[in-house]
Amino acid sequence: SSTWGAAVALPDIEITEEDEEELKQLAVKCEEIGAEIDSVTNRKNNSKNVSELVYKLSMQLGLAPGIAMLNFCAAMIYDAGFLALDSELINATTLTDEQKQEMKTHVELAEKHLDFVPKKYWNIFEDAAMKHHENMDGTGYPKGLKGDEIPQIARLIRVAESYVSLSSKRN
């Protein structure tokens, strides 16, 4: 099976002209939340950089522009769960094992920050937020998904986030 998800079901979403304005408004809201996430996590432009890379990867994979835009929006707020965690925990230089486990809860905590997402796009955003720490070999969290069990958006964010992290200075 394909690493990039030929075997994975793509979002069954048709983006119409009427949806374009809604997508623009969604992008603006996601950019606002992304900036807030970056402020809380002390990662300057992380959301912007990850989402732009996800968009470029989506287009390179031949996804429809509307789906690429949805992926961009979802990637902007994939770490929304950090908004529910204490900033001292997020910015600690060292973490105890217990604190590491608490940090991992950001994937489940994201859900409460996605209430503005239109229902028809919900699954993409939920997959982005809750599954971006899953690994192809099953060693990720929170569910230990592997291979084709991991949605395409989560794979794209995993790759983009890793690249951005490796190529950026932490503030």
Q: Language model features by range: what are they?
A:
Residues 3-4, 9-171:
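Histidine- and acidic-residue-rich, metal-dependent catalytic cores
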